[in-house]
Amino acid sequence: MHLELLFAALVGSASLASGGAVLPQCSPATPIQWGPCPSDLPKDVQCAQYKVPIDYSKPNGEMTTLAAIRKKSESPKPKGSVFLNPGGPGTSGIQAVLSILPGSQPSKILAEYDLLGVDPRGVGQSTPIKCDPAIWNKRVPTLVYNEAQFDAMVQHWKEAGESCRRLTGPLLDFMDTKNVARDFEQLRQAVGESKFNFIGLSYGSQIGYTYAEMFPSNVGRMALDGIVDHTKPRVYAVEAEANTLETTLHRFIDWCGNNKTCALHNNTDIAGLIKRLAAEAEVSPIPAPKCEQSGDLPCQSNVNREDFLAGIQGGLILKTGMPPYQPGWSELAEYLLAAGKGDASGLSAHYYVGETDTTGDFASLAVGCQDWEHAKGFADLHAIEDMTIVFAPLTLGITQSLSYVTRCVAWSTPLKNPQQPIRQSIADTPEILLVNSFWDPAASVQWAVSIREQIPNSSLIFRHGSGHTSYGLNGDTSKAMNAFLLKGKTPADGTTFES
């Protein structure tokens, strides 16, 4: 979900039913005007800004600006365009395109297609969500044990949401994934494509199948990797992500035991170390002396229990990391070893320094609070958290799914796009390719199977490995995705690749 996938170290880094009244039709999209990018960007890309309605029920009302980038195909006669979304919510499509390395599997799309990256509404170089960083830097526990703690959490995130509303304006009310899908439909028309070709990673998978449900006749080739299931109730979402995180953590522990390069190789009880440090951080946050509250990677001066556990999930995203922006398993082991010695800098949470946020966290919560069901009160949340700890005794369910259940209880915009089964309109699309690794710390293979069952014209392939998404790893799974995108070759449903 909101966990940045890096294609290179250049960057630090789904409403399934349309429902409700039929929206007024927008006028045919005006063509997008591509032009030069800023001088600090590569010469082989073009940039554009494009205005879309904030509220599609008022197509002639207030507009918001989307920023986009295009990397031209190597072919003199390209087949068209492929849109790339790296997930989040809140992650930049522009940065994803810029970070693709020559010779990598993602770069091979350029043999036959232009590659387009868009910063979705509220994100990055598009008109951004703005919030008060001072409020966001206050850390209030979301694992609550009594009514007073619950009330404190609700009040904190109510104030955070109100700050976002005050600084952002009406855009905050229209951040749900249906509106993101409508934006992509406007851009498809503006670019002049008859079909929407799309690579969606992580949360991008939710954008993809939401678009396919809303505009089935416009779908071209669509590959979705690291599947998010936005069709089941909140308890299912929290428990599935908690379980896949916990399972992946145990894979990491086994890897350390079998790999002499792991900094914790000689530790015979890594699970015990994690439990001890989490308990200590709950009582007294662990210092993070290497963190500064400024610069390119500002982070908190200490690490509480939830920061510590969230940092572990972040370290499991890529088995081979790209530090300092994205740690891998080796770095995670080093961070845990250092934390055991009193320095948890490597696991510290982001420190917010401005009204706009480079991590995408502001936009992520703005989307999540409109897309995902919230806890109905203290008793409901306490039951969910108690149940989750059974599935995840080490990580305690500290995941993005839980953050939406907790932080959104009193958010300043209503739930607009709650989970529900995919509508049957999606049966009218061409073949859609779904991809998941077996041990993804943020996107459960259980989610992928659920979505496969709801999209008749889909095939689900697996990577026999760990980590969040597969496309950027340049293995056989990436090659299979490209064979589908470039040639229309669909692997047999259920195929498993080793890389």
Predicted regions and their residues:
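Secretory-pathway/luminal and periplasmic proteins that interact with or process carbohydrate-rich
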Residues: 283-288, 319-322, 359
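Fungal secretory targeting signals
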Residues: 1-21
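Gly/Pro-rich cap/lid or specificity-loop segments adjacent to the active site
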Residues: 21-307, 366-367, 372-499
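Acidic catalytic loop of the alpha/beta-hydrolase fold
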Residues: 318-322, 439-442
